[in-house]
Amino acid sequence: LPAKKKTDQTYSSVLSSGEFHKISIPEDGVYKINSAFLSASGIDISAIDLSKFEIYGNGGGMLPEIILKERPEDLTENRIYVYDENSNNRMDANDYILWYAKGPTTYNYLNLFESYEAIGHDFDVASYYFITWEGAAGKRISSLPSGEQLTPNVTVAQYDHLIYHESNEENHIKSGRRWWGDKMQIDRQKTF
C-alpha cells in the first residue's frame, strides 16, 4: 500500500465561522443572484456588503471513492462578477452577482469511442455553493477598462452541446446505488 499522505496542517473549514447560506445548483451554467432571490430566501438584503460578497464551492461531481485519490481539503472561493449600479456596496433592486457554477453531473471524453460519458451523482440531484458577505473582500472576475476591446484569435462557428437525460426513478431491490430510468410498462411508447 502507498504511504499515507502526511499533513502538518491544522484543518479549519471556511464554514467554521460566520454566517453562510446554501444554494443548490441543478446543472452547469452561469447563475445570477439578485435582491429578489435573496429576499425570497428570507435574507435581509440591507445587511449585505457587496464588496465582501463571496461564493464558496467545489463544483459538481462526487468526491473520489478511493481514499488515496486527491480531493479538495476545503471549499474554494469562486470568482464572481458584481454589478453594483450606483457603487454603494449595498444590494439594491438592480444589483446582481453572476458566476459560473458546476452541477452534479460530470463528463469524461472517451477517446476510444470518440464520445462523452456522463457521470451522474449517486447521492444528490444538485451540487451546492455557499454565500457570505461577512469576510474580507471577495474574489472578482476582472473587467476591461471602458472602451478597451480584446481581439479574438479563434472564432467558433459550431460546437457540440451535450444533453444528458437520466431520471433514476427505479431501484428494483429498493436499496443500493443502482438506479434505472423510467419504468417501462407493457405500453412501449414513451414521450420525453
Model-derived regions: residue spans:
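A short glycine/threonine-centered beta-strand motif
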Residues: 27, 32-40
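Structured catalytic cores of large enzymes
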Residues: 1-26, 41-192
